[in-house]
Amino acid sequence: MANVVVVGAQWGDEGKGKIVDWLSERADVIARFQGGHNAGHTLVIDGKVYKLSLLPSGIVRPGKLSVIGNGVVLDPWHLVQEIAKLRADGVEISPESLMIAENAVLILPLHGELDRARESQNSVAKIGTTGRGIGPAYEDKVGRRAIRVADLADEATLALRVDRLMVHHDALRRGLGIEPVDREALLTQLREIAPQVLPYAKPVWKVMNEMRKAGKRILFEGAQGALLDIDFGTYPYVTSSNVIAGQAATGTGIGPGAIGFVLGIVKAYTTRVGEGPFPAELQDADGERLGERGREFGTVTGRKRRCGWFDAVLVRQTCATSGVSGIALTKLDVLDGFETLKICVGYELDGERLDHLPIAADQQARCTPIFEELEGWSESTAGARSWADLPGAAVKYVRRIEELIQCPVALLSTSPERDDTILVTDPFED
């Protein structure tokens, strides 16, 4: 039996929600280990749609323990809203089904204000932040001035933490022309929200290790995608946390030896939200067609996603940096009806061919894609549940992807419905 880490292997929006839900039915624990409420995931269960951005996907399944690890930055007000919305939809949530790391960092209103002010004043190169305060919260964590969940339990400690935080933020706000933070108003907000958050606070590292020793199946749920990783993504157009699989251990307090299988979620084409390099991007009718057929709009922001052909170079890189054991290929059905498909197999930069994306942003922007053409198919792949249900050209497309990324397909998803999945390798039994 293997504990499984699920990571996005592109720029996010790969369809992780469905795959995590599909796996969570057999997991005992589902844990978020990085990010905040900036990356949404959509679940379709028995025809009902759930849109989550902070809570783990397992929260909608009775009898599962959902965990928000220390690697996550937590907006407590958004947490309470998301819990209330799910309860209104009939989902039962209690401290027995949801656990939050007591050392998780809080996102405060001042973080969102700072995030948005910086983005609006940055006329040189916008990062494309969602403006929800995730980046500034991580800055405070690394700067050792953050307020954490456990701080809510002691008013004297909380007041000291706020004072220390204000020294930094008031200086930043003066430079940006923003009014100073109202310290007393912030303390009042934190005191009011504390009773709604503290019942879920636990030493997650301890519980996770106890679960592991008891032989419980653990599913680690990543948000966003490896190409947005703060170290290995297309910097500076990245998120503020590590997204790759190694963060699953750091972000929950469990040792790396607990990870048995890394499942990389990969869309059958490529999308990206916001700014940054995108070598295989299509700005023509094919790109529009992919966006329309794939309904490529962000779950959280509603922003239209940029679309392009499958980039094998980038996925090969992310499979390496996350140690991916196998991929789940999603949205194959979006490619139905294309006479010809293309896969990016390399880049050209200043007359040289590259087999990887260079690290320097200016070089990334100058890379042009080298495409390989494949025959498309006219038949529908939607709802296929076995290889025999797929057109021959679709099977060839999948096999070519495996060859190029040097990683096998473990799962193939052919629609948003959780059961429309072709299982090749069971991650939990690997």
Swiss-Prot record:
Binding-site list for substrate: 299-305
What's this protein's family per the entry?
A: Belongs to the adenylosuccinate synthetase family.
Q: What keywords are annotated for this sequence in UniProt?
A: Cytoplasm, GTP-binding, Ligase, Magnesium, Metal-binding, Nucleotide-binding, Purine biosynthesis
Per the UniProt record, the source organism is Cereibacter sphaeroides (strain ATCC 17029 / ATH 2.4.9) (Rhodobacter sphaeroides)
Q: In which pathway does it act?
A: Purine metabolism; AMP biosynthesis via de novo pathway; AMP from IMP: step 1/2
Catalysed transformations (reactions): IMP + L-aspartate + GTP = N(6)-(1,2-dicarboxyethyl)-AMP + GDP + phosphate + 2 H(+)
Question: From which residue to which does any coiled coil extend?
Answer: none
* Protein's name according to its UniProt entry: Adenylosuccinate synthetase
Q: Which GO terms describe its cellular component?
A: cytoplasm
The gene name reads purA
Q: Which residues bind IMP?
A: 13-16, 38-41, 130, 144, 224, 239, 303
Cofactor(s) listed: Mg(2+)
Might you give the EC number(s) for this enzyme?
Answer: 6.3.4.4
Residue sites binding Mg(2+) per the record: 13, 40
The keyword Transcription regulation is annotated on this UniProt entry? no
